[in-house]
Amino acid sequence: MKNFKLSIMAMLLVGAAACNKTYNGTTPKSNSAPTANAGVSTDDAADMASGSLSLNSNGVANVANDVTLNAASVPNTHQACGIVKADTISRQSASGASVTYSYNLTYSFMLLCDTSNHPDSLSSSLIYSGSYSGPNISTTNSGSSIFTVGGLLASAPDFIINGEYKSAGSFKSKTDTAKNGSNNIDIVVKGLTLKKPGRAIVGGSATIAISGDVPKKGNFSYTGTIVFNNDGTATLTLNGTVYTINLYTGVKTRH
């Protein structure tokens, strides 16, 4: 009888081990946790940020160039205080460019004056739509910006920009075809400084928030800070990871 009981117990243990092996080897757990940040890595988010910053993808640097060009022309256009001026631009990349883009932009500019009716600052609002394709990611998006440009007086050495840039649309990764979905980007700019007369970016800062959704994988979210340098780059810190963004080419370098 003792041997019979031991045989039954051994059979049960072997059966349990076999079931467990089959479950672990071939059957996924039904309550498995979603992939962290929907599989969108910090590097992926940095590519999105780069596209929202650089000149060749209708980023903040491009918009800053447009609005300060308009600000520089105020003395020649004799724009009246409080009057809204509209401007529409269609912009495409050059043939054969490594980064391709096509955007339609509609600007509204209003000159703000002091109590003596002298130009004080320029308010700009923008709505845009289009697409770009970079080395690692492609995006179709639309968005807006509201920027105020200070430093209109001829004696001021710099143009100073404060405001917000927003983008919403869809993205596709070129390095992993499984990574595609929707994204939203919000950049709040503070003291973005462009040196006169060439209007090169020489300083300023910003905060950035990137969020979105990947079908069947869930949501992702990243936040960070941006420091605009005086050498054509910006330092992006995203969830603690530091990158250098080339504001002309959009190329990112991780540190």
Residue ranges and their predicted role:
Residues 1-7:
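Bacterial N-terminal signal peptides that target proteins for export
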Residues 7-13:
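Sec-dependent N-terminal signal peptides
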Residues 15-18:
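C-terminal motif of bacterial Sec signal peptides marking the signal peptidase cleavage site
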Residues 22-255:
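Low-complexity, intrinsically disordered segments exposed to solvent
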